[in-house]
Amino acid sequence: MTQFASPVLHSLLDTDAYKLHMQQAVFHHYYDVHVAAEFRCRGDDLLGIYADAIREQIQAMQHLRLQDDEYQWLSALPFFKADYLNWLREFRFNPEQVTVSNDNGKLDIRLSGPWREVILWEVPLLAVISEMVHRYRSPQADVAQALDTLESKLVDFSALTAGLDMSRFHLMDFGTRRRFSREVQETIVKRLQQESWFVGTSNYDLARRLSLTPMGTQAHEWFQAHQQISPDLANSQRAALAAWLEEYPDQLGIALTDCITMDAFLRDFGVEFASRYQGLRHDSGDPVEWGEKAIAHYEKLGIDPQSKTLVFSDNLDLRKAVELYRHFSSRVQLSFGIGTRLTCDIPQVKPLNIVIKLVECNGKPVAKLSDSPGKTICHDKAFVRALRKAFDLPHIKKAS
């Protein structure tokens, strides 16, 4: 590798916590399931010119492995089992599972293989893409600028929260996948550690090295895959919720609600699930409307909302988090996950709006029909129609 293209990643744990949480569940429950996933740039960025540099980084990723000190640290956490961690010790990224091409200027990436392996590509690969693009586009930007921006926003944050009881305000770093760089994310997290309301990070490598609490449960792909794993499509979301509880009966219990819209989720989230899960995570749609629906649902089921946690993680910044805190803090426990607005917030730097999402499970289509129309993902229109019918969804939202 050239110096300019030095490896972005230095640890297998430089990923989001929920990837390992889901990987263990897949390892135990769905060892032989195969999946395919695709990269999407939601903006108008033409990233195809970076295909060669990204391919080079993907080749370098096969040399990452779980180190002994990392293995020991994971072993001390309460939710990982020895059989999974011993398997993870032997895990290596397989670059043959990833195809990268420049499609008329657009970056085209497809991943396929056993779910237990493919599941780990998404977050580090997105972090690689983000960092490589910013290396080329913004060579003048640096860590000091990111820190200066954060300091300025923390001054505004202090003014915004003056006189406000912040004892129930909890903020997490969710910024791995679209960070400007690994160095920027670490610097930002170290600074936030000085604040009493900062409670952890989704990044396992940072959590280990900085003695932080790792944060995360499951992602859309857990629910998407069950659309083909479950023999009954209409029951697939309940099957996903139940399988998660089998793996994690009394921990990691924050459920993601928007794989097939919040309303469809709540119809499946009956009193048993609502009692056993510790809370819910918002990732699309109007956050106030979502939170009100969640609280009303708990109350309808006879569950005290104060005993549950709502996690907000959709396109948040500090100001939005405070607005939501003011609205909800007296009625429910709250946590806020901020990503891009912390780890890629530098003057004259345009963050990338990039994702990698599941598109197939065992050779058949899966879909994400979230509460934000632009986040809908699926190639197969017939399957989308079947999914809408199975979950009794209203008007059709335009897929992208």
UniProtKB/Swiss-Prot annotation:
Keyword line: Ligase, Phosphoprotein, Pyridine nucleotide biosynthesis
Pfam family, one: NAPRTase_N
Modified residues (Phosphohistidine): H220
One annotated Gene Ontology cellular component of this protein: cytosol
Pathway assignment: Cofactor biosynthesis; NAD(+) biosynthesis; nicotinate D-ribonucleotide from nicotinate: step 1/1
One function term, GO molecular function aspect: nicotinate phosphoribosyltransferase activity
SUPFAM superfamilies documented for this protein: Nicotinate/Quinolinate PRTase C-terminal domain-like, Nicotinate/Quinolinate PRTase N-terminal domain-like
Any single GO BP term: NAD biosynthetic process via the salvage pathway
Entry keyword Magnesium: no
Protein name per Swiss-Prot or TrEMBL: Nicotinate phosphoribosyltransferase
Species in which this protein is naturally found: Escherichia coli O139:H28 (strain E24377A / ETEC)
Gene: pncB
